[in-house]
Design a protein with these regions (language model features):
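Short, solvent-exposed helix-loop connector elements
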Residues: 22-30
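Feature 926 captures the class I aminoacyl-tRNA synthetase adenylation module centered on the KMSKS loop
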Residues: 29-336
């Protein structure tokens, strides 16, 4: 097994299934998946090193951090705290799952892709490099107990301040690197990108087919900052942001909690199918709202349930009411 997939992959797999009272079902496929995870980390490190070059000297975190920098720094800061807490409680499986999700999704699939914009244009590249080194270093240290060989190998290749990763300082939570506002703002942008990509995938539209994207939102300043992210990651030729638009003609409409997005795709889209999708989404939202309102109209629930739970239901009802209004408006735009 070690000869085929590597010791790190085997260790990671065994830790993944580690939970008190849990008999792990071992399989080659799980070890193979861990090997693929190690490859993902290795390729991410190679990407970072490619842009650092041979003479790079880590200057420390700069002050001119962009929103995406604050977002990833805040996320890895929280990760360090949570993984440390998990390890102290011997929750190895939970710690490994958090590391896997962060490295694969948050760092590789989001931050690195967004960082490419600055690295390739040159504007803000130095800041992006410094943040990449900082986050990658913390990742390696947190992952080292589970994958000691690959983390040591990468650690030796990037700027480092100790002879071995084994004697380097363990990452600690830093309150100055907690950026809750930037995290919330990035989530709004990422939700929009996910929604656009999902809709394009449903319609089998290839990335090469770019379209202008119109974003109707009350958070224009947030989406203005993220417009370049939308262009790159949601295959937009251009992004226009406003608190309202006139008649845009035939468009595909995408609704998130924070924005209403229009994509004029012309004859690439089956508008009858789009109308059916919106009607289905509207019916589901109306059913969910009716269920929540029934609970809120019940004095027994309102008086006996924890105040926090009642408020969560009220907030959800408000969001659904707004979503329903947006969906109905979208159907009107399609003439349905």
């Amino acid at each position: 097994m070690i000869d085929q997939y590597g010791a790190d992959a085997l260790r990671f797999t065994l830790a993944t299934g580690n939970a008190p009272g849990n008999d792990m079902r071992f399989s080659d496929e799980k070890v193979k998946a861990s090997r693929n995870f190690a490859n993902k980390l290795w390729n991410a490190a190679r990407f970072v090193l490619m842009y650092l070059g041979n003479d790079y000297s880590y200057p420390g975190l700069p002050k001119d951090l962009a929103i995406e920098d604050k977002w990833i720094l805040s996320k890895v800061n929280t990760l360090a705290k949570e993984v440390t807490d998990n390890l102290e409680r011997f929750e190895l499986g939970i710690a490994v799952a958090k590391l896997y999700d962060f490295i694969w999704d948050v760092f590789c699939d989001w931050y690195i892709e967004i960082a490419k914009i600055r690295l390739q244009s040159g504007e803000g590249a130095d800041t992006a490099k410094a943040v990449l080194v900082y986050v990658l270093t913390d990742i390696l240290k947190l992952l080292h107990p589970f994958m000691p060989f690959i983390t040591e190998e990468i650690y030796q290749a990037i700027p480092h301040d100790t002879e071995s990763i084994m004697i380097s300082k363990w990452p600690e939570y830093d309150p100055t690197l907690s950026f809750a506002d930037e995290e919330a703002q990035m989530e709004k942008i990422m939700d929009a990108i996910r929604a656009i990509r999902n809709r394009r995938a449903e319609m089998n539209i290839p990335p090469s087919k770019k379209s202008k994207v119109y974003v109707e939102t009350a958070f224009a300043d947030v989406f203005a900052v993220g417009s370049e992210f939308i262009k790159r990651l949601a295959y937009a030729s251009d992004v226009e942001i406003a608190d309202g638009f006139g008649d845009l003609g035939n468009t595909v409409t995408i609704v998130t909690n924070d924005a209403k997005i229009y994509i004029p795709l012309g004859d690439l889209v089956d508008f009858e199918a789009e109308a059916k999708r919106l009607q289905k989404e509207l019916a589901a939202a109306e059913d969910k709202l009716a269920f929540i309102n029934k609970k809120l109209d019940n004095p027994g629930f309102v008086n006996k349930a924890p105040e926090k739970v009642v408020q969560q239901n009220r907030d959800e009802a408000a969001k659904l009411t707004e979503k329903i209004a947006n969906l109905r408006s979208s159907l009107e735009n399609l003439g349905k």
